[in-house]
Amino acid sequence: MHFLDQAKIFIKSGDGGPGAVSFRREKYIEYGGPDGGNGGKGGDIVFEAVAGLNTLIDFRYTQHFKAKRGTPGAGRDRTGAGGPDLVIQVPVGTQILADDEERTLLADLTKAGERVHFLRGGDGGRGNASYKTSTNRAPRQHGPGWPGEEMWVWLRLKLLADAGLVGLPNAGKSTFINAVTNAQAKVGAYAFTTLRPQLGVVSHKGHEFVIADIPGLIEGAAEGAGVGDRFLGHIERCRVLLHLVDANDADVATSYRVVRDELEAYGADLIDKPVIVALNKIDTLDDELIAALSAELEAESGHPVMALSGASGAGIEPVLDKLLEAIGQPEPGPDADEEEKGGDWSPI
C-alpha cells in the first residue's frame, strides 16, 4: 500500500430541495387553496475517523465530494426528504486544514469513531403554502432551496504513536523497529532506505505501545533538505523520542547534534519532548570503544546513553523498559495476564 500523508480535496454539502407549487384539489372543496410543501434540507459533509486506515492515498484518485440535495416538496403540505449526509472516512490522526496561506486548523480527528459535521446542507425552499396571506390567497411563488456550502480543504495525516524514532539516515532505525515489532520496514546499507513513516506495535511485559520510524534527518532538513522534514509532523504527538546514533559514525556527538538542531528548527516543541539516547550497532565494537563513545555522546547530549544492537538484539530489552517507563504504562494488551507482565518483549 502506498503511503500518502496529505491531500487536497473539494467538498460541497447538498443544496436544499425546491418548495412545491400545488393547490388542494378535492371534491366539494371549491377553493382548496395552496398546499405546496417545503423542500428537504441538503445533506451535510461529515468527516469520520476510522481505525484501520493509515494513509490518505484514496484521496489522490477521488478529490471531489458532493452531498446529495434535498428532495422537492410536494402537495398536501408534504415536506421533501432531506438529502443523506456524505460521510468521508479518514485515518485516525487526520487534520483538516483551510486552503489558505496559514493552513488554518479546522478540525483534528484523534479518536476512532470521532465525527465532525463539517459543512451543513442548504435549507429547503418554501412551498407556496407558506406564501399565503390575507391579500394573496393563491400564491404561485416558491423557494428554490438554499445552496450548500463548498470549499477546498487540505487533509494532513499525523500518525498516532507513543514513541518516535529519530536519527540520521542509516542509523539503524528500521532494523530496530523490525527487531521489536512486525513492521517489516525496508533495510539497506545506504541512506534514505526508509522513504515513508513506519508504524509498529511493541508487546513488552504485558503492555503494548506504538512506535513510529520516520525517514532519517540530515542537516538542513527543516529547510527542505532530504526527505525527513516532511514527516516530522508524524512524531509531534509522540510522548517520547528514541534518538538512535550509529556507533560507526566518525563523530557521534556531531551526529547527535545535527538531528537535535533540525528538531529545534522544525518547531512544534519537538525539542522539548522527553528523549532516550541510544548508541546503536554496538555488535561491531568492543566494550572499551563502546564505553568511550557512550561517554562522548553523554557529554554532548546531557542524557544517559544506552547501548544496543538492533541486528543482534543486544541491549534492546532495557531500552524497551525505558520507553515503557517514559510512555507511562499504556493499557495492558488484550492477552496480558499477571504472569505475562513480567515476561520479555516480543513482536506481535
Swiss-Prot record:
Its cofactor is Mg(2+). It is an enzyme of class 3 (hydrolase). GO terms for cellular component: cytoplasm. Transmembrane segments: none annotated. Residues 120-145, 326-348 are annotated as: Disordered. InterPro entries: G_OBG, GTP-bd, GTP-bd_Obg/CgtA, GTP1-OBG_CS, GTP1_OBG_dom, GTP1_OBG_dom_sf, OBG_GTPase, P-loop_NTPase. Its main location: cytoplasm. Belongs to the TRAFAC class OBG-HflX-like GTPase superfamily. OBG GTPase family. This is GTPase Obg. It comes from Sphingopyxis alaskensis (strain DSM 13593 / LMG 18877 / RB2256) (Sphingomonas alaskensis). The gene is obg.
